[in-house]
Amino acid sequence: MLENECLEFAASSDEEVCGLIVGNESLVRCRNIHQDPRRHFRISDDDWLETEAAGEITAVFHSHPEQKLVLSGADRSGQLATGIDWWLASGGKLRKFRPVEHLLGRTFKHGVMDCYTLFRDAYHLCGIDLPDFERTNGWWLRGEDLYLKNMAANGFHGVNMQDVQLGDVFIRRAFPESDPCHAMIYLGDNTILHHENTGRLSRREPLRPAYLRLTHSIWRHEQCSSLDFRGVFDDISAKSL
């Protein structure tokens, strides 16, 4: 099995190992030519071109010898440069990451790059995969309650404001008369990550009193203990560099 081969390769070295996945069927092992192979990896141009000549490269594989099953900031920059999935092995586990856009600085497009896309992608980078769902513009005015229906159906439960913690999701109204329709991810220290349909880019900012007044509920995933928010913070640091 391909995943097992990747894990065995990762376990064979106390440095980062790397390779290329061809056609989602085979692993081509590559030499890590980075000057600091315990903390980083680099695949040579020759290895990449030789592998590409043999078949379609569908993913990049590498390992983290330390216990860190999320992509680093350098990994995220590298992934977006390749535009393909990256597979990561660490601690005897394998995780596959889609090449989602950096979390900060996104341009809003409803149903494609909106507040739920940001929420879903942030959780993906932290280790929890959420489904996408169809949504048409104006659903928050038609009583469809997409957030409230989908939060409960996908492992989230409500929590109180006094118990809020890193990774919780605030669901608020866009304005007092609308249904709850906007997600804000709590980053700790009274800071949120969100993407509004106001012509502004996705951003992190303080949790403002105005946002709290419009908040309908706060949600926490049943597997919140498995969330590794280093995946979000490393992506933010990579975008901020």
Where are these regions (language model features)?
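Conserved beta-strand-loop surface patch within small alpha/beta domains used
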Residues: 1-57, 65-98
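Extended, compositionally biased flexible segments
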Residues: 56-65, 195, 200-202, 206-217
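Second-shell loop/turn segments in exported
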Residues: 104-109
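Active-site nucleophilic cysteine motif
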Residues: 110-126
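Surface-exposed patches in mature extracellular/periplasmic domains of secreted proteins
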Residues: 130-135
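...with weaker cross-activation on analogous glycine-rich loops/strands in unrelated enzymes
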Residues: 136-202, 207
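Glycine- and charge-enriched low-complexity intrinsically disordered segments
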Residues: 205-241
